[in-house]
Curated annotation (Swiss-Prot):
Gene Ontology CC entries for this record: photosystem II reaction center; plasma membrane-derived thylakoid membrane
GO biological process: photosynthesis
SUPFAM superfamilies the record matches: Photosystem II reaction center protein I, PsbI
Protein name per Swiss-Prot or TrEMBL: Photosystem II reaction center protein I
Source organism (scientific name): Synechococcus sp. (strain JA-2-3B'a(2-13))
Stretches that traverse the bilayer: 1-21
Lineage summary: Bacteria, Bacillati, Cyanobacteriota, Cyanophyceae, Synechococcales
Family: Belongs to the PsbI family.
Location(s), subcellular: Cellular thylakoid membrane
HAMAP family noted in UniProt: PSII_PsbI
Source species, domain of life: Bacteria
Encoding gene per record: psbI
Subunit relationships: PSII is composed of 1 copy each of membrane proteins PsbA, PsbB, PsbC, PsbD, PsbE, PsbF, PsbH, PsbI, PsbJ, PsbK, PsbL, PsbM, PsbT, PsbX, PsbY, PsbZ, Psb30/Ycf12, peripheral proteins PsbO, CyanoQ (PsbQ), PsbU, PsbV and a large number of cofactors. It forms dimeric complexes.
Keyword field: Membrane, Photosynthesis, Photosystem II, Reaction center, Thylakoid, Transmembrane, Transmembrane helix
NCBIfam families with a match to the protein in the record: PRK02655.1
Amino acid sequence: MLLLKISVYAVVIFFVGLFVFGFLSNDPSRNPNRRDLE
């Protein structure tokens, strides 16, 4: 069960890091007319 818990935490951290990296690399200041954030 410990290995399963570590695997789940690794996947969650991976997806959170991927989301944060994608959000930071996609700078909203370059796209002031974005309407998908409303």
